[in-house]
């Protein structure tokens, strides 16, 4: 849902640049949101092949866009702003707690891919290929994006007199309509690949699989698309605290037990060895019907404990406890 909102913003701002009167139309953003949601669902119904083609097209552009924004900010501001020279406002235990909250929220953002990364790595040419791609691409890409975001936001304070952290708003302020429209449309396309790959593809596969063949992948996509609307991203994005501390930390806390069970099962019980054929055999050792009498009670125990930890963490303003504790405890129970 969050990526749908961001992508819809790209479309909406691009239309406003081309047609300034667009903002006067009632429910203009709602129209942009529904159109972008429909486009995302249609792309996802085409499967992994379509995602790979679109990702190959948009990923290089994101790197170029980051560099352009960085150069533009530095040239127009004449410096990197106050970010580098400004003294720290927090330290000690408070700094540690805030860092752990940010780390937990970041892990929560990646939680869906942690659980379903095999839906993508199975397309890798080799084990070595996906290990190198993940080890090199993720740290460099994620760190680079964070650094550019911080530096450009700092430059915006000098240029506009206020900190503009939203890259869409910042891009719209560049005095070049053609560049702005082209950039926003590319960003919208990139959001589709990011959203579907990280948050939608794997759950849709799960819905189709759990249905026992009664639902096709395309039908699962439409079901998941409707469910995404129920998260009401337009409300989540009204506050960074609501999005980061509440949504990401809570979702990460509920997904952590699943990751804990998977990790423990693979390392400690299976000793990193799996029977691949049995994984896809409906009557094999991994068949849910054979394990359901054990899964059901333990699933309830894990989720009740995880839910309590999440709520207590938020109530006590110790958000970082929510997911890390849930994951560690689930690994013990498994």
Regions found by a protein language model. Give the residues of each.
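Hydrophobic alpha-helical segments and their helix-loop junctions in multi-pass secondary transporters
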Residues: 4-17, 61-87, 109, 149-158, ...
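Membrane-water interface regions at transmembrane-helix termini and the short interhelical loops
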Residues: 13-19, 35-58, 73-74, 116-126, ...
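Hydrophobic, membrane-embedded alpha-helices of multi-pass small-molecule transporters
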Residues: 36, 70-76, 88-152, 176-197, ...
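Membrane-interface loop-to-helix entry segments
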Residues: 31-76, 134-138, 248-256
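TM-loop-TM module centered on a large, flexible mid-protein loop between adjacent transmembrane helices
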Residues: 144, 148-195, 213, 229-241, ...
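Transmembrane alpha-helical segments of multi-pass small-molecule transport proteins
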Residues: 17-45, 60-66, 102-117, 181-186, ...
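C-terminal membrane-solvent junction of multi-pass transporters and transport-like membrane proteins
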Residues: 258-334
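Hydrophobic transmembrane alpha-helices that form the core helical bundles
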Residues: 1-21, 191-208
